[in-house]
């Protein structure tokens, strides 16, 4: 695993942990609605996808997994913009930056194969 892959894993874990923190925080506050569950599911989604991306036994579907992770991340950013942008704080903006950089790195890995081993 090269530096690019390590960066991708770190960014995915960072955004996953942010979503886990938000989900737990919302549950602890007793806030109802779907948001706590969505945050927790987002955590699970990031962890499962980034694990599947680099799991040796799933290498044959790595390209598809990479694209799914990119779309998943983009969808997360878009839905945040549509649902919660008016309630954004510094943590939200940091998380969106992490997610955008994650997408950029995944695109780099997809289109420049030599980066996969660098």
Describe the residue ranges of each PLM region.
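Membrane-interface extramembranous regions
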Residues: 1-118
């Amino acid at each position: 695993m090269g530096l690019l892959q390590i960066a991708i894993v770190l960014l995915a874990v960072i955004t996953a942990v942010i979503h886990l923190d938000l989900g737990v925080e919302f549950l602890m506050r007793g806030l109802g609605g779907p948001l706590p569950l969505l945050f927790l599911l987002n955590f699970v989604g990031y962890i499962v996808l980034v694990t599947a991306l680099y799991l040796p036994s799933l290498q044959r579907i790595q390209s598809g997994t990479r694209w799914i992770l990119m779309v998943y991340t983009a969808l997360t950013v878009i839905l945040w913009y549509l649902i919660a942008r008016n309630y954004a704080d510094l943590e939200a903006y940091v998380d969106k930056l992490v997610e955008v950089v994650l997408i950029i790195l995944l695109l780099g890995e997809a289109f420049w194969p030599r980066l996969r081993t660098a």
